[in-house]
């Protein structure tokens, strides 16, 4: 099969996605998946704004995937109540707290929020997409956009621009990984997996600091998540103010 000419494909359906692939041989190039959409879609999770990232044949930023429905239904979980306060969103793998997206004021995403792809970048120097995430956060934020871009086929850059509404907002940045994390400094985490390394670097804001959170389930009915963690940082945004969260994922070439 002949590889496609374009290194990026974008779909603008109810659950819009942008997919980047720069190589077609095993272990070669980069793979990026960027997801918009809505939790109100059939079988959806609260994962709008999420991304996955693969480099050097290693999946660095991952999605834990769904939990098998029967394992929840046999425990009496009201899985098909998809209202804002429905029990579906208490399932560990289904809400936004354990996806590679933003969380504001510790709250779940708005079920009826819908994240469109605003723009797609198709040049080799910048491959990626931007998303409007505003509707996920209700009255907590006035504006929120995310840009996920593969820069010069060297590293992935994730840029979030947020503006608080009429009250302060606490914004959490999250990335799920099955790599082994090592904190090099407050702004840099080194991930190691399958003999390869990746640096995750906070470029902005300067006061932000990484921490590592175990993916220990919240309830007895939740599936275990062995070998995976979340790397997170929190940013406090004053009422009405704007803030930029900028993170680089840089493969270490040795």
Task: Enumerate the predicted regions with their spans.
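CBM-like, beta-strand-rich accessory domains located in the C-terminal region of large
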Residues: 71-254
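Carbohydrate-active enzyme catalytic cores, enriched for enzymes
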Residues: 1-60, 122-126, 130-132, 230-232, ...
